[in-house]
Each structure stands twice: as C-alpha cells, then as structure tokens.
Amino acid sequence: MSADDLILHYFEDIKEGQSASLAKTISESDIYLFAGLSMDTNPAHVNEDYAQTTVFKTRIAHGMLSAGFISAVLGTRLPGPGAIYVNQSLKFKAPVRIGDTVTATVTVTGLVPEKKFVTFRTTCTVAGKVVIEGEATVMVPARG
C-alpha cells in the first residue's frame, strides 16, 4: 500500500451509513509472520500435525490477524490517516484458514461531535460469512 492509497476523511465529512472495506487473502507466510510479531505461537496456527487434532482439522489464522484488517481500514480508508483507536469490541464467529480471503468492512453508526469520535460497526467476512463482528470508536481529525 502506498501513500496514494490513503484516503482522509475529516470528522466534518463523515456521515452515518458511510462504509469502507479492504480484502486480503491469508497466506501461510502471513500466519508465520504474525506468530513471530505477536509471539503467539499456538500450534493451532503454526503446526499442521497438531492442528489436525483440533476441532478445525487444519491450521487456522490468528483471530487478531484478521481483526488487524479492521485497523487497516480505519487507518487508511475511513476515516483514514490520523484516526486514533479509542475502543474496539470483537466477537470471533468462525475460523479463517490459509487461502481464505478476508474482507474487513467498517460502517459509521454514530458521531460524537464534542469529542470528534466516530463509532463504527466492524465486520470481517470470508465468502460472505461473518467471521468477526464488533464495534469500534475512533477519534478523527477535524478541519479546524
């Protein structure tokens, strides 16, 4: 992603119902890189032999890897650069596997003008199925 891909929405420009999305296909490398960065080396993510003994029968991506795509949308698309996370709730609904394409979407659900806060419904889907849902509050830059 380059600087040309960044989209900035000032608080005054944001309206309820606005939404933005990003999609990423999960690779084996993504899982190993995330495991290294997060120090979460749970074998359900990094060891296929172990993962085959789990309810999922194969390795699954870290939930927070997919949740990170929500942060990417908020920081690069809506509201965009300068947005600061205040709060995020997440509910993990289904696993994400290697090869799945995760689409993270944020939709404006409320505005708090005195604090320049925006609330969002946040979701991640795979093939139209919700795998993560939640709500975020973000502080957004104002024009003035």
From Swiss-Prot:
Q: Which UniProt keywords apply?
A: Fatty acid metabolism, Lipid metabolism, Lyase
**GO molecular function of the protein, one example?**
hydro-lyase activity
The GO biological-process annotations, alphabetized, read as: fatty acid biosynthetic process; poly(3-hydroxyalkanoate) biosynthetic process; protein homotetramerization
User: Which Pfam families does the annotation name?
Assistant: MaoC_dehydratas (PF01575)
EC number from the UniProt entry: 4.2.1.119
The membrane-spanning stretches of this chain are: none
* Reactions accelerated catalytically: a (3R)-3-hydroxyacyl-CoA = a (2E)-enoyl-CoA + H2O
Q: Which InterPro entries match?
A: HotDog_dom_sf (IPR029069), MaoC-like_dom (IPR002539), UPF0336/Enoyl-CoA_hydratase (IPR050965)
> Which top EC class applies here?
lyase
Limits of the MaoC-like domain: 13-128
Q: What job does the chain carry out?
A: Catalyzes the hydration of trans-2-enoyl-CoAs with a chain-length of 4-6 carbon atoms, forming the corresponding (3R)-3-hydroxyacyl-CoAs, which can then be utilized for the production of polyhydroxyalkanoates (PHA) polymers. Cannot use trans-2,3-octenoyl-CoA as substrate.
Q: How does it assemble?
A: Homotetramer.
Q: What is this protein called?
A: (R)-specific enoyl-CoA hydratase
Give the originating organism. Rhodospirillum rubrum (strain ATCC 11170 / ATH 1.1.1 / DSM 467 / LMG 4362 / NCIMB 8255 / S1)
